[in-house]
């Protein structure tokens, strides 16, 4: 896969460095056999241009297809997951009727099985779970967002006034797969707020309360 080498070499040149610690494939390429991609990735590792390999937006079968041909281990899978995006928690169709997880993908189960670290982008649902944005009336997920925010706010007092943002991140951090939320902001205070989520020890009962609120249905 020539584009893989072109991509990493371009990144190295732009940053003025000799290697990257982690190189992640942004998404699967349906027009390239995974054996071809794996061969190029292994060359990059052997040449010292890349230390570790990860993937992004890969479903379990896609990860297995790449892993079959790859000598280097896959150490990360960067995925969209939050209380508003629950699919990675489920295997197959384990979600409830009418819930946002009615067709789960089981990524987190695979991460546990294969010792892959899940990296969560959009951990507060594109900002909606901060509670600082007004949800438009025509937003397709308005009811779900508001129900989840209500549950987060009701839980605040039990965790020393934790914000919805902090509790939403703490919910991810509590999962046994070892999720690492990817957060960012131009505001240092927002960074401090999100970092403080790591100090919250969410109880099992409260974790499930948030899950039920986010699903919009009881857990079977």
Give the role of each language-model region.
Residues 1-15, 61-64:
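Short, acidic/polar
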Residues 12-33:
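Active-site groove signature of glycoside hydrolases
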Residues 30-220:
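Beta/alpha (TIM)-barrel catalytic core signal, keyed to glycine-rich beta->alpha loops juxtaposed to Asp/Glu
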């Amino acid at each position: 896969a020539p584009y893989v080498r072109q991509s990493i070499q371009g990144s190295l040149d732009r940053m003025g460095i000799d290697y990257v610690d982690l190189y992640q494939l942004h998404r699967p390429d349906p027009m390239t056999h995974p054996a071809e991609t794996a061969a190029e990735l292994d060359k990059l590792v052997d040449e010292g241009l890349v230390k570790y390999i990860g993937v992004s937006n890969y479903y379990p079968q896609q990860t297995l297809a790449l892993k079959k041909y790859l000598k280097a281990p896959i150490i990360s899978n960067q995925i969209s997951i939050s209380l508003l995006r629950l699919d990675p928690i489920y295997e197959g169709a384990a979600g409830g009727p009418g819930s946002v997880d009615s067709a789960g993908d089981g990524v987190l189960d695979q991460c546990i099985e294969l010792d892959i670290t899940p990296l969560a982008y959009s951990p507060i649902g594109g900002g909606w779970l901060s509670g600082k944005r007004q949800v438009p009336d025509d937003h397709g997920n308005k009811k779900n967002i508001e129900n989840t925010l209500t549950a987060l706010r009701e839980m605040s007092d039990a965790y020393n006034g934790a914000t919805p943002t902090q509790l939403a991140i703490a919910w991810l951090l509590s999962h046994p797969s070892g999720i690492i939320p990817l957060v960012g902001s131009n505001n240092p205070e927002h960074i401090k707020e999100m970092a403080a989520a790591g100090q919250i020890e969410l109880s099992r009962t409260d974790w499930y309360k948030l899950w039920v609120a986010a699903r919009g249905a009881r857990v079977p």
